[in-house]
Regions:
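Feature responds to low-complexity, polar/acidic, surface-exposed segments characteristic
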Residues: 1-68, 72-105, 116-140, 149-157
Length: 157
């Protein structure tokens, strides 16, 4: 469903950051439990898991590349989750190196099962290929799945 040209199922950067940050909260009395969105964005930027563009434009629609970057950096910085040593399973993603800066973020999340790949049929043959689809916009449902997968990883470590 579209409202004035934008899909209402698409999640914004700010909404995603708010929901992801809930993974960090430890106690109901944690001062972070009362943080406003502008304060949260400033905090994330200061800590290094958000970029300037995320803080300045929280209403921007979230794409998969941005979600991977934010999620990876959040897990690394706020939850102290270390990188996997072997990310070779991610090399089957045909577009992994579309963004060389993002490649490790995407590979880490893909190998942990936090974000998935999409199968695409290049032609009528049966040789489907896996793609991350960097610039595809994320729906709220997909974002909630990513956050649930992060929660599972958090508890498994």
């Amino acid at each position: 469903m579209k409202v004035s040209g934008q899909d209402i199922r698409v999640i914004s950067v700010g909404e995603f950051v708010s929901q992801l940050f809930a993974l960090r909260k430890k106690e109901p009395t944690d001062p972070a439990a009362q943080i406003t969105l502008p304060e949260l964005l400033r905090f994330g930027h200061f800590r290094g898991w958000l970029e300037d563009a995320d803080e300045r434009n929280p209403t921007a629609p979230l794409n998969r590349q941005t979600a991977a970057r934010i999620t990876y950096e959040f897990l690394r910085i706020e939850l102290s989750i270390l990188d996997l040593v072997d990310i070779s399973p991610a090399t089957k993603l045909k577009d992994l190196y579309t963004c060389r800066v993002c490649a490790n973020h995407i590979a880490q999340l893909y190998c942990r099962g936090i974000m998935d790949a999409k199968k695409e049929e290049p032609d009528s043959t049966d040789s489907s290929q896996l793609f991350f689809n960097h610039l595809e916009l994320m729906t709220k449902e997909e974002a909630l799945t990513v956050i649930a997968n992060c929660e599972a990883v958090k508890h498994s470590i």
